[in-house]
Amino acid sequence: MFENDTIVAIATANGIGSISIVRVSGAKALEIATKISKKNNFKARLATLSTIYDSKNEIIDEALVIYFKSPFSFTGEDVVEFQCHGGVAISNMIVDEVLNAGARLANPGEFSKRAFFNNKIDLTKAEAISKIIEARSADAVKLLARQLKGELTNFVDEIREDLLFMLAYTEVSIDYAEEDLPTDIYEQIENKMQKISLKLSNTLEASRRREGMIEGFKVAIIGKPNVGKSSLLNKLLNFDRAIISDIAGTTRDTIEESVRIGTHIIKIVDTAGIRDASDVIEKIGIEKSIQAINEADIVIALFDNSKICDDEDKKILDLIKENSDKKVIVVLNKSDLQNQFDKNVLDSFIELSTKEDINPLIKELELILDSNTFGDDITLVSKRQVLAVENTLYNIGLAKEPLKSGELEFFAHFITQALEDISSITRPYDNDEMLDVMFGEFCLGK
């Protein structure tokens, strides 16, 4: 739980700006606002222009003061916001006066924590608030806005409702065997289990596909040494991030940079050239390259049109086949130079010249990124949420055999575990909810 006191913090980012907001939450919020403004006529949800004074009765600033009366506030408590002139000094001076009047500094995330304990938000909304502040792309903002609106909460509630249904009927079967139950109840339960499993599996698949929407999709550029990987990276970034040299093995480590493609943020990884290397440091770089490929959402495989397809190129082609689950864009570089490369070994490819722009590659990247981000599938935005869904699926899987064999106590145990797992996404599971369903659905003790 949290302390039942009054907290204060600056709600806007540090630095120079036109406006700063100081937020106060707790039972003494209105009292403190009255004290430091010498006004007592604040009305809920109305902005009042007020002069803010320090303890020596000297003017600090003129600010708009907005009072949110409990429970109609973000935290569910009395909240006062001081919208003062921007900059570091003024907002800190107001915070000092609020502290002198009886508040304490808020801990990181404490306003959201209070909102959670006062049932103003659930854990999914708390996570969305945290991540939307750090969002770097329009994709991320749109995805997190859906979670803020309650999309994931509604999804979890539907799963919980079905699991509570199963558990309620199972408990009745165990404790009140003489009760008349629907003849097809176990068939209903089995069907619900199948539907839940499919929903959760689809959600996990969509979430893995869209994982890069929040942090940025990882794009690995691979190819043998001196094929033009660093040059391509620099063209994508529009500045010289990687050293360009005719000497094979110049890039000995992975280089990672972020860039915007359309509405998407991608993290481009320029890998060390993949070949049989004798240099120890270069070998480490190649190992990191292979790791980068394994971790990438999209792979750009680069080949040199002006050189024959050799064993090193074939090694790259083998890597592509080994990573067939990934989106791979094959690029035949230096297409304006004399053709030496056997194009028949490539199923499909994009040609890039040394003189023209890379728009064909940009368009292909955008198509793949769009396909990963568009759609109405429920998406999990944190590892905590993913783990909760995985555990729910696992326990539903364990419950199947006891249901078939009639071992209802074991079945109830695994369904209870699944219920606790899925509930942890929004807020901890309360066993009283299951009892409410059980006693509400059946006439026990008639």
Swiss-Prot record:
One of its GO terms (cellular component) is cytosol. GTP binds at residues 226-231, 245-251, 270-273. It is found in: Cytoplasm. Its EC number is 3.6.-.-. Disulfide bonds: none annotated. GO terms for molecular function: GTP binding; GTPase activity; metal ion binding. K(+) binds at residues 226, 245, 247, 250. Its main location: cytoplasm. Binds 1 potassium ion per subunit. The keyword Metal-binding applies. InterPro entries: G_TrmE (IPR031168), GTP-bd (IPR006073), GTP-bd_TrmE_N (IPR018948), GTPase_MnmE (IPR004520), MnmE_dom2 (IPR027368), MnmE_helical (IPR025867), P-loop_NTPase (IPR027417), Small_GTP-bd (IPR005225). Transmembrane segments: none annotated. Keywords: Cytoplasm, GTP-binding, Hydrolase, Magnesium, Metal-binding, Nucleotide-binding, Potassium, tRNA processing. One of its GO terms (biological process) is tRNA wobble uridine modification. Its cofactor is K(+). CDD domains: trmE, TrmE_N. Residues 216-370 form the TrmE-type G domain. It holds the Pfam family MnmE_helical. The keyword Nucleotide-binding applies. Mg(2+) binds at residues 230, 251. Homodimer. Heterotetramer of two MnmE and two MnmG subunits. Exhibits a very high intrinsic GTPase hydrolysis rate. Involved in the addition of a carboxymethylaminomethyl (cmnm) group at the wobble position (U34) of certain tRNAs, forming tRNA-cmnm(5)s(2)U34. NCBIfam families: mnmE_trmE_thdF (TIGR00450), PRK05291.1-3 (NF003661), small_GTP (TIGR00231). This is tRNA modification GTPase MnmE. It comes from Aliarcobacter butzleri (strain RM4018) (Arcobacter butzleri).
